Amino acid sequence: MAIEFPKSSHQSGLRFMNRNPHPKKERHGDCGVRAICLAFDLDYDKVWKRATSNKRNNAPVYCYSDGTGSHYYERSKATATWGLSKDDLIETLQDFNLDVVYKKTAYKEQGRNVQMYFNAGNLPDRCIAHIPRHWVAVRDGAIWDTWDSRGKRPRKLRGYVCLRSDL
């Protein structure tokens, strides 16, 4: 069911809904996990565990030498607490059987790069927007996040992740 809001006075055309799905209401760099939970109504702990697993599997394996000729290989101990890459985020959504696609919004026109902006007219009704250094859930004409990432000036939109059926 779509929620109806009055028209936003913000330059992005989006409203801000302050939401934090973290069980302890902590605020740190888990924006990818928060965005997945808020955009697709999934449980935070399940998403965090799956995203952490994907992040570790996609990370490089480190090789150490102790100086005696022995080599030790170690996998990354990174967690989803400090951000997700585009591949980690998409793989996590696919693990929940969501048929998603990343739509890049930059393109070349007459030899120069053209970048779209984080604006209601450039996004589908439900998606995860990729803005510089951040993922944010967009649903029903509003951003759903722990802080107002719309900004005072127009922000570049790198791309967005949405269901293939929403394209």
Residue ranges of model-derived segments:
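Short glycine-aromatic motifs
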Residues: L14, L98-V100, C127, P154-L157
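Functionally constrained cores in energy, signaling, and assembly domains
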Residues: A39, A137, R158
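Noncatalytic regulatory segments and standalone regulatory/sensor domains
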Residues: D145-L167
